[in-house]
A protein has these predicted regions:
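Beta-strand-centric surfaces of beta-sandwich/beta-rich domains
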Residues: 1-7, 17-167
Length: 167
């Protein structure tokens, strides 16, 4: 124990950002009562100002087969403002990002990431699948996060996209 005397504690940078009030999340869910029809998508547009390059964590979930996409420099209009949640609920700091759900997409832009989520496959299929990824986004760039229900039997499925980041 003597060697730890006067030692400084260390914290993960993610935890530091959370404590400082620089951690944010948003999400959109299609519930079991209001599932995402086969072939349709949840679309979320997200953008940040110049000079802000957030480290973002992407999580997607679908009760059946789905494909998740991330596009950079997508062109969209309209949509509904999506609230960005402060992960430190005591913080007074607001996110500098802007998010929309359900925009009209006129150009997908460049495909950055694609992930297949398989749900309910085989004898031991669990009925759902989650996937995720982390990356650093660029400021002054519009990103489109898309989760498409790819159910081959034309079944609607519960689905969600959750995005979390530090600024």
């Amino acid at each position: 124990m003597e060697k730890y005397r006067d030692a400084y504690s260390t914290r993960d940078i993610e935890q530091v950002r959370l404590i400082e009030g620089q951690a944010f999340s948003l999400g959109y869910v299609r519930t079991f009562a209001d599932p995402l029809p086969a072939g349709q998508s949840i679309d979320i547009a997200l953008a940040f100002p110049s000079g802000l390059n957030p480290i973002i964590s992407i999580s997607g979930l679908c009760a059946g087969n789905a494909i998740g996409y991330l596009y950079e420099n997508a062109v969209m209009t309209g949509g509904t403002s999506l609230p960005i949640i402060k992960r430190n609920r005591a913080s007074t700091i607001s996110s500098q990002g802007v998010a929309l759900v359900g925009p009209t997409v006129t150009s997908l832009g460049t495909l950055v990431l694609q992930e297949i989520l398989t749900g309910g496959v085989g004898k031991k299929g669990g009925g759902g699948e989650a996937g995720g990824n982390n990356l650093i986004l660029k400021g002054l760039t519009t990103y489109l996060f898309r989760l498409t229900n790819a159910d081959q039997n034309n079944n609607a499925q519960a689905a969600e996209i959750i995005l979390s980041w530090n600024e």
